């Protein structure tokens, strides 16, 4: 929403995915990138909208600095999950019981949906009117595709911040310069 407001203030024309459902390219950042170019995204709370844009793109290019690279997704950045407000505590318990997420601690995000840090006493609400659960891991997720599938098939889960096999290329800024992984 902030980007939309800034674009309007600057007179930049906007359109919608309903009008143009195929994009040549989408460019975005990521919270974590594993060696297979799987991603954790949505730390800012817009994971569903981000995923909807990326699936409409013929190419999805990710730009990160080298601190976002990891050996396995999970322990470096909480995995956000967007859930419905209705029966949200039940959904939280279901997520906590998923076999592929053993060892994770699901926590309802409090405060601003755009911060993965508690910055208020109210439950964080997304632009879609849903809640965010942050999954905190001490070990990397062992089977990322299975975790993504189990989350997606959990009643009450709208979507998750695991972006599996979606990136075409990752542009990485590091201490030795910029390089691309495909």
Describe the residue ranges of each PLM region.
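Conserved phosphate- and dinucleotide-binding cores of soluble alpha/beta proteins
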Residues: 2-182
């Amino acid at each position: 929403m902030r980007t939309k407001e800034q674009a309007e203030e600057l007179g930049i024309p906007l359109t919608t995915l309903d009008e143009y459902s195929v994009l040549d390219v989408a460019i975005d950042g990521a919270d974590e990138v594993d060696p297979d170019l799987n991603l954790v995204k949505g730390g800012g709370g817009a994971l569903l909208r981000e995923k909807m844009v990326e699936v409409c793109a013929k190419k999805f290019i990710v730009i990160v600095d080298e601190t976002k690279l990891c050996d396995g997704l999970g322990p470096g950045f909480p995995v956000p999950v967007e859930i419905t407000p209705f029966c949200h505590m039940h959904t939280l318990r279901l997520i906590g019981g998923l076999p592929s997420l053993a060892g994770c601690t699901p926590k309802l995000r409090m405060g601003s949906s755009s911060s993965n840090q508690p910055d208020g006493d109210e439950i964080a609400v997304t632009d879609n009117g849903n809640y965010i659960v942050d999954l905190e891991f001490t070990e990397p997720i062992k089977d990322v595709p299975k975790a993504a599938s189990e989350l997606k098939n959990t009643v009450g889960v709208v979507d998750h911040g695991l972006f599996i096999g979606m990136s075409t290329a990752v542009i990485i800024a590091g201490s030795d310069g910029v390089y691309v992984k495909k």
